[in-house]
Amino acid sequence: MPQMDPRALKATSVKAEDEHASSAEPQALKITAASSNPKMFTLPWHKPLATWPEDLLANLPRGISRHVVRFVHVGDEVYAMKEITRQVAEREYEILRRLQKLELPTVIPIAVVTGRHDLNGEPLEAILVTRHLKFSLPYRALFARNLQPDTAERLIDALAVLLVRLHLAGFYWGDVSLSNVLFLRDADAFSAFLVDAETGDLQAQLTDGQREYDIDLARTNIIGELMDLASGKLLPGDVDEIEVGNRLVDRYHSLWSALTDTDKFSPDEMWKIEQRVNKLNDL
């Protein structure tokens, strides 16, 4: 039976409970973090995140989220803060910590803040804190900048690489989309970073069914996101949304096959080894 990478097991730092289980909220403010930033204690945790004062906020492009998200100045750093339930915040913090231990491209988890109450004593949702990835952009901000015509294809290629790396590590995403990724320019290409692990699960090894579910969901979500861009006149007219969605599936399978297929070579078939190395380099 496949064993989980011991690096991931050592990363657990929060006892994350089942999000459907009922348990009492902490009565006092609690900041759980791998390392402390004293400035964290000066923030207005007693206020809903949507009402935090403008002088604390960093004006950075935000992707689409079903939760309240803000970029906040904390000393010399900028943190992304997401307001969610305590169980979900603790679980996502733990998963991100484990993915970081595996040296996978994700945002860096900083803290989870629980036990928040307003001045009237009413409970507020928890906040997950991650470090803002410098120079990164959500996909909508990239398309708003009138980039090259092949931008969509290059973003898809980056997402395919990210998805393969996560799957090889045993991470089932459960909500693959352009919205849950940040992109960094990497010469003429892009690098993709996981930014939302809310629905994810880290296992010793994924089944083919789990991988295919992620891929199929990614294709569906990407086509929908690109159609949304097209309706807002942000997508070049010659881009076929369905073709781009299919490209992710093709690129994923090509890369997965190149990395995981086993071949047998006889001593006089060195050219086959060269051929495989060249294929990996091309991918």
Language-model features, listed with the residues they occupy:
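Short, low-complexity Ser/Thr-rich regulatory SLiMs
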Residues: 116, 183-187
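Long, charge-rich C-terminal accessory regions
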Residues: 274-283
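Juxta-kinase regulatory segment immediately upstream of eukaryotic protein kinase catalytic domains
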Residues: 2-58
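Beta-sheet entry/capping signal
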Residues: 127, 180, 191-192
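Conserved ATP-binding subdomain of kinase catalytic cores across diverse folds
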Residues: 40-153, 157-174, 221-223, 228-229
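C-lobe/activation-segment region of protein kinase-like
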Residues: 190-261, 265
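Catalytic cores of secreted or luminal carbohydrate-active enzymes
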Residues: 268, 272
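Hydrophobic residue at the +6 position relative to the catalytic HRD Asp in the kinase catalytic loop
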Residues: 176, 181-183
